[in-house]
Amino acid sequence: MNKKHLAAYAIVAVLFAASGAYVGMNKNNPAPPLTAVPPPGVTEPVAALYKQTLPDAKGVATPLAQYKGKAMLVNFWAPWCGPCVQEMPELSALASGEEGKKLQVIGIGIDSPTNIAEFNDKYKITYPVLVAGMSGTELSRQFGNAQGGLPFTVLIGADGQVKKTYLGRLKFDELRKDLATL
């Protein structure tokens, strides 16, 4: 093997090592969740949400129009979504705490009624958990969730306007700051 080949192999090895280090560092530091503040006056998806009547985890029909006039935090989730499950205890605490007096937290499950009911029975969620099945993905897309990623959370003011959307696991410090502006 001559020196030119040896130098080329060494350069390739260094490039592979650098690539591996870069990938390894990004796995430890995942990208932050995406949040968006829609332009003022965005109400069309909220009107579509209020037109929905979805069954809860026990199969009881729940018209979402009953929440009109109240600030809402709508969380699109699924039982198989790890980050969704991780944020649920904090959402439950939020719903049953001081913030819950001013804000209606709602979970919209994107899965079968059976899976949602089993999950709800196991984890004892303190806020309404509704079943949308796969149509929940389309509903979340109306709020700007183009890829249908989960969890996806929408903060809606009492005025019926979308205040902010969050894609990925919620950062509750950021959420509490946003709630203070309602």
Locations of regions flagged by a protein language model:
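N-terminal targeting signals for export/organelle localization
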Residues: 1-51
